[in-house]
């Protein structure tokens, strides 16, 4: 799961207990339903509102709280309890047979779309079918393609091409893989391999229902149909989104969601300092920032050790989130291992971390893409002992000397016109860019040119192979408590977030063979050890420049309560926020 904050991405470690510095906001006896809840963001839009295209943790948390339902979900609760799997559209967590290759679910009674029409198995199958239209429905997770028992053609592509193509499209294969009962109440998934935690996969909005008659292809992103407690009244990117109550939603058929405010407004394009000052001054006590807090304002809310100041108790938190940040090196363009390593050793990471607020707020230096909270999937990476927080120019220059001999073309590019570095357009990232540029030039002779991209458009750009630069900032967290949702997703060519573009790297065939074999490994301990070994393999080839095991800060107005950090989505549980008065 990718991060949409600054630039971090995906779902939390389901078994971890995230440290919450401030705790759960207390509920007052006078709180009631009603009023308008406001969210503020510097982004010009959500990354995606279309459920099949939604793959950033905060957006998953937001839309799954207010609009989009799935067969299963996570319990709305703080701490480790929030990682408990619960039934949503389904009556239970499913029945697995055939060595976990067949999964059956029954839909609850009374579940409907916003127009009152019933949600059926066919609607869920149609929603999932959109994932296969990879030329139209972009940026979302691809678990359906990798897990469902739909044959591949000679080129390794699915014989089913999605709902928008007719010629040569094997629709019967979809119907066999997702079988619906005659009454539309029972849905059976037939998988190509054993997946013991498939019911966790179904928490993703990409497995949610879409009414075929309302599907508008890529334009569905602007007006998706709701199955949750709210529906869209207005969505105007660069302006605002307004949600109002869905009169056809019933708490009786949706026991896991709340519907406290009458209206929810998201204001886009708010300058970062203006956004922060609205919350800091409490000029809008019903408002919450969606972007965290500028590093320059952290000491107003928190003590130097990261704890919440007394006057901000109940209005802010500073938590370890599930994300790992990194800079994906586009190996198809920077196909020179010594240069990739030189970038890692040359950067002044200490200064970059200070811009992010230091370790009390930014987090801890990462050694790969798997966080220690993953337990048996994590093992400390070796071979990085020459890393220095301030940069290691001696090591970096030696690597550049090697690159000059072994890959002169890439060396000439890096030291000449330079490498293009994609990142989100924000004040903090612009400050960090200066450090990157100066330290790589000084310590390795590498020239960098930054490509600053508007936040709401960022992933659409960097996941487009024709538009991505040489290096791209990103962040990821496991989709559930298994690094099968990290390593393959980030580095297999068919993964959901393959920004490193490693398919033509000489080291890729071995990685591909081992990763695909490990997806089939039934012994969880052996599987975890191999994910840790493949994390080491990734770092041996420096397919990413590791960043941080991150922390997140949120703050909100004085009239809000019920705010807590929701572990599995790495974001607040937005649907539990209410107005005090």
What kind of region is each of these model predictions?
Residues 106, 123-125, 130-211, 236:
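Surface-exposed binding/hinge segments that line
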Residues 180, 353, 388-389, 446-460, ...:
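Extracytoplasmic/peripheral linker and loop segments enriched in polar/acidic and small residues
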Residues 230, 363-405, 425-431:
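Structural transition elements
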């Amino acid at each position: 799961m990718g991060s949409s904050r600054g630039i971090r991405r995906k779902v939390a470690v389901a078994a971890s207990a995230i440290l919450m510095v401030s705790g759960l906001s207390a509920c007052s006896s006078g709180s009631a339903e009603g009023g308008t809840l406001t969210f503020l963001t510097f982004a010009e839009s959500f990354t995606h509102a279309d459920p099949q295209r939604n793959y950033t943790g905060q957006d998953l948390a937001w839309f799954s709280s207010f609009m989009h339902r799935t067969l299963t979900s996570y319990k709305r609760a703080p701490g480790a309890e929030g990682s408990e799997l619960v039934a949503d559209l389904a009556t239970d967590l499913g029945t697995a047979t055939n060595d976990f290759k067949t999964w059956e679910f029954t839909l609850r009674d009374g579940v409907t779309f916003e127009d009152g029409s019933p949600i059926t198995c066919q609607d869920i199958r149609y929603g999932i079918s959109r994932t296969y239209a990879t030329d139209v429905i972009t940026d979302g997770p691809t678990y359906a393609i990798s897990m469902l028992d739909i044959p591949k053609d000679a080129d390794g592509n699915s014989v089913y091409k999605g709902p928008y193509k007719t010629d040569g499209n094997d629709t019967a294969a979809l119907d066999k893989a997702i079988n619906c009962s005659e009454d539309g109440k029972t849905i059976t998934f037939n998988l190509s391999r054993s997946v013991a935690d498939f019911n966790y996969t179904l928490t993703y909005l990409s497995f949610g229902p879409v009414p075929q008659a309302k599907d508008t292809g890529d334009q569905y992103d602007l007006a998706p149909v709701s199955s949750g407690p709210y529906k869209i009244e207005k969505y105007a990117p660069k302006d605002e989104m307004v949600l109002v109550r869905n009169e056809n939603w019933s708490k009786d058929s949706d026991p896991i969601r709340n519907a406290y405010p009458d209206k929810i407004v998201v204001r886009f394009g708010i300058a970062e300092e203006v956004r922060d000052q609205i919350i800091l001054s409490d000029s809008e006590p019903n408002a919450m920032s969606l972007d965290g807090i500028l590093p320059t304002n952290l000491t107003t809310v928190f003590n130097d050790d990261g704890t919440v100041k007394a006057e901000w108790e109940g209005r802010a938190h500073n938590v370890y989130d599930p994300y790992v940040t990194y800079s994906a090196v586009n190996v198809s363009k920077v196909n020179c291992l010594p240069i990739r390593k030189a970038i890692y050793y040359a950067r002044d990471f200490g200064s970059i971390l200070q811009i992010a607020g230091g370790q009390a707020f930014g987090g801890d230096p990462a050694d790969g893409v798997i966080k220690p909270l993953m337990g048996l999937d994590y093992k400390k990476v070796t071979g990085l002992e020459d890393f220095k927080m301030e940069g290691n120019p001696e090591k970096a220059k030696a690597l550049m000397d090697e690159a000059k001999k072994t890959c002169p073309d890439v060396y000439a590019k890096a030291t000449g016109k330079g490498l293009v570095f994609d990142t989100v357009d924000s004040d903090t990232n612009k400050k960090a860019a200066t450090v990157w540029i100066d330290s790589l030039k000084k310590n390795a002779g590498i020239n960098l040119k930054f490509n600053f991209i508007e936040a709401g458009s960022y992933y659409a750009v960097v996941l487009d192979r024709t538009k991505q630069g040489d290096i791209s900032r990103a962040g990821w967290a496991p989709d559930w408590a298994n690094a099968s949702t990290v390593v393959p997703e980030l580095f297999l060519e068919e993964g959901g977030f393959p920004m490193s573009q490693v398919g033509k790297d000489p080291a890729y065939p071995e990685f591909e063979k081992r990763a695909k074999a490990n997806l089939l490994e039934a012994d969880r301990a052996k599987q975890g050890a191999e994910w840790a070994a493949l994390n080491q393999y990734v770092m041996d080839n420096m397919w990413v420049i590791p960043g941080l095991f991150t922390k997140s800060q949120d703050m909100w107005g004085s009239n809000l309560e019920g705010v807590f950090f929701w572990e599995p989505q790495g974001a607040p549980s937005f649907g539990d926020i209410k107005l005090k008065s």
